Amino acid sequence: PAIKRVFYPGLASHPQHGLASTQMKNFSGMMTFQTHEAGMAIARRMVKQLEIIHYAVSLGHLRSLIYWIGTDDIEQSTFRHGPEAASRFRDYMGDGVFRLSVGIEDGDDLWADLVRCF
């Protein structure tokens, strides 16, 4: 499979699923995932091949949006770790993650759009 790891509190396998269940009625339309293949290569394909999902940085839109962010960018903009913690973070995160904000389009159409890029 192309997907290595999914971060979504609506999944029973998510480490904070229990907490999310008490805080969210229907979880959310935001999820993050990693791929086995280099994320930047997939992101470049997405820019050319996506027909329904828009490759853009934003939140809270009716349209579905996806964006890839590299681990270097995540570390520079969000986290401040000591060297040992930074090393563990990089091992866990790989080269980066995709953030998908699901809009109101049909789920089967969105799935087909994503599959085309992998």
Regions picked out by a protein language model, each given a short descriptive name:
Residues 1-71, 84-92:
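Conserved small-domain helix->loop->beta segment predominantly found in fold-type I
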Residues 37, 64-118:
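PLP-dependent enzyme catalytic core of the Aspartate aminotransferase-like
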